[in-house]
């Protein structure tokens, strides 16, 4: 049985935000199984959404648009239209296909994201959109059977890392130098792989399976940022 992690990149901050892409990676939660950054990225998928078709239906907020203008060129290129762009309806269908193909048990698997008020509410609202398209009335919308894992198995990455490292507000975990070679911040699939590794290493440090690296041996890309 695998767990999974999701990350949306968006044009807003609420559950109705326009979605740029959705990344998902299924992973083995066993702390003795530590895969490389590249191995995790290669197992995952990134679903790129058509932004134009979301105008008038989902929210594009001015502050988020301005925020994207200040990100790296590598991150901003993910916003540009591409031949791989799909509708939100088709994108969620691709997401469901991936979940079903990777040994995810909706009753036992844990689903992870960085902040419980962001990714899962967006995912649930996109599932509701599918129900609306199928003619389900607003007072009958019910996503319980359609979510990839039950709500009580949805977990927050920040809380996990903070609890394992026993330091308030420490929501990133120092990783050995070279662990994140090739990482691009705000590339959703890279963010997912990074967070899997942070949770794994935080657990390994807590269990005494491995010592945390010294400051000199720490990967600088794993050190705290503004977010």
UniProtKB/Swiss-Prot annotation:
The gene is dexA. The keyword Isomerase does not apply. Transmembrane segments: none annotated. SUPFAM superfamilies: Ribonuclease H-like. Its EC number is 3.1.11.1. Coiled coil: none annotated. GO terms for molecular function: single-stranded DNA 3'-5' DNA exonuclease activity. It comes from the Viruses. This is Exodeoxyribonuclease. Pfam families: Rv2179c-like. It catalyses: Exonucleolytic cleavage in the 3'- to 5'-direction to yield nucleoside 5'-phosphates. 3'-5' exonuclease that preferentially uses ssDNA as substrate. Plays a role in group I intron homing. May play a role in the final step of host DNA degradation, by scavenging DNA into mononucleotides.
